Amino acid sequence: MPRRGTIERRIPPPDPRYNSVLVQQFINKVMQRGKKSIAEKIVYQAFDLAAERLKKPAMEIFETAIRNAGPVIEVKPRRVGGATYQVPVEVKSDRRQSLAMRWLLMSARARSGKPMYERLAAELIDAYNNTGATIKRKEDVQRMAEANRAFSHYGRF
């Protein structure tokens, strides 16, 4: 246990366009090699494209996509008497959002062809509609947790 107490989480300032911390965190995840202006351009273009295609506000699409893509339960390895069990645990809201953003981005990058903003917009639309690679990933994680429900008693110490 640390003796110095806990460190407060740094929350980035909200982004200028949507005034949302969540969007700023997403921009930071999209950013590569410190090129934030390019990441902002990609995210904003993707939001505009998704809003245009679905005829709904961009923030509503993004928040719903994040909510749909985040897992409720996941497995964590726990070593008990020489054997490692995959123990299902509930996912905290911060981690749920972080995983959802990470998976959305990974799925968008895995798509081929087209510019990044189009791939990201397509992935956001898929997550909004509860389809696509991101949702499949979430369902796989939750299925794994469900399969290992027998070991859930190891999660409580």
Swiss-Prot record:
GO terms for molecular function: rRNA binding; structural constituent of ribosome; tRNA binding. The keyword Kinase does not apply. GO terms for cellular component: small ribosomal subunit. One of its GO terms (biological process) is translation. The keyword tRNA-binding applies. It comes from the Bacteria. InterPro entries: Ribosomal_uS7, Ribosomal_uS7_bac/org-type, Ribosomal_uS7_CS, Ribosomal_uS7_dom, Ribosomal_uS7_dom_sf. Gene3D superfamilies: Ribosomal protein S7 domain. Keywords: Ribonucleoprotein, Ribosomal protein, RNA-binding, rRNA-binding, tRNA-binding. SUPFAM superfamilies: Ribosomal protein S7 (SSF47973). CDD domains: uS7_Bacteria. One of the primary rRNA binding proteins, it binds directly to 16S rRNA where it nucleates assembly of the head domain of the 30S subunit. Is located at the subunit interface close to the decoding center, probably blocks exit of the E-site tRNA. Belongs to the universal ribosomal protein uS7 family. Part of the 30S ribosomal subunit. Contacts proteins S9 and S11. HAMAP family: Ribosomal_uS7_B. This is Small ribosomal subunit protein uS7. It comes from Roseiflexus castenholzii (strain DSM 13941 / HLO8). The gene is rpsG.
